[in-house]
């Protein structure tokens, strides 16, 4: 298939710049790809789409305040680093601006020297490997100096950084939020659990590759970014029990889908505890092995995320649903509305 097969016109005013006051007051488009039906609803009604005995699978990653502003001690030149992933120990892969000033051996100071970064390797496209030095605990230093790395299409200042975290965010490590989970409130999750739905958590640390457009025409030539994932034995056992009892595995967001399908592909459809790096690219033609239904936000044109949704529900029907969402003025992207796919 061709990248342009997943293109659509999106009015800029539909790109949500701020979150709604209430997380679960966003709109929800419920689609059934077998019945070819679409129903306009609101997110707090997602509970009606879940059955007793189902498992609702959520990504409990927490977004790091990963954007750092510092200066070179020799020239006092301003430098911006965006943390992408922890490679080992105190070493991180980062995106640097301006990258051309930062050669191997260069040093950058943050917060009057409370945090220092030394460049130890140069990568393409402005990437660098840095080693940090600091006193105390790295995450505490980062919390005091870093800023939340909002997506490039959000231009408004975020008043409350916690609104770019899910209410169940726990495991530090993401450069972006698993945005399908932003709609859930603690109260809504309690109601879902009281209905007899199993709440299951996994971890996938979201990288900035999630915003990277597909730059090739032929999808088979696309180089998918890799992200770290983890599923515990307790979570895996719950999911196996749910499947065996005839319940559904309902994923919250594309990151949960990618984790579950990575594991399903690795273990021939079985669900096992596992951790590692995944670069799975789910596109039309892929046979789903674990996920039975899911919720997700509305994604960028020509993105791998639109392709993933199309792999499950069919490209033509998904694009028809997107046209409906645009006509009905649904809000798009990270702070936007949601879709439930049966």
UniProtKB/Swiss-Prot annotation:
InterPro entries with a match to the protein in the record: QueA, QueA_dom1, QueA_dom2, QueA_sf
UniProt-listed GO biological process terms: queuosine biosynthetic process; tRNA wobble guanine modification
GO MF annotations in UniProt: S-adenosylmethionine:tRNA ribosyltransferase-isomerase activity
Catalysed reactions listed for this entry: 7-aminomethyl-7-carbaguanosine(34) in tRNA + S-adenosyl-L-methionine = epoxyqueuosine(34) in tRNA + adenine + L-methionine + 2 H(+)
Endpoints of the signal sequence: none
Compartment(s) of residence: Cytoplasm
Pathway: tRNA modification; tRNA-queuosine biosynthesis
Record key words, sorted: Cytoplasm, Queuosine biosynthesis, S-adenosyl-L-methionine, Transferase
GO cellular component: cytoplasm
SUPFAM superfamilies: QueA-like (SSF111337)
Domain of life: Bacteria
EC number(s) reported in the record: 2.4.99.17
Coiled coil: none
Family recorded in the similarity comment: Belongs to the QueA family.
Subunit structure as annotated in this protein's UniProt entry: Monomer.
Described purpose of this protein according to its UniProt entry: Transfers and isomerizes the ribose moiety from AdoMet to the 7-aminomethyl group of 7-deazaguanine (preQ1-tRNA) to give epoxyqueuosine (oQ-tRNA).
PANTHER family reported in the protein's UniProt record: S-ADENOSYLMETHIONINE:TRNA RIBOSYLTRANSFERASE-ISOMERASE (PTHR30307:SF0)
Protein name: S-adenosylmethionine:tRNA ribosyltransferase-isomerase
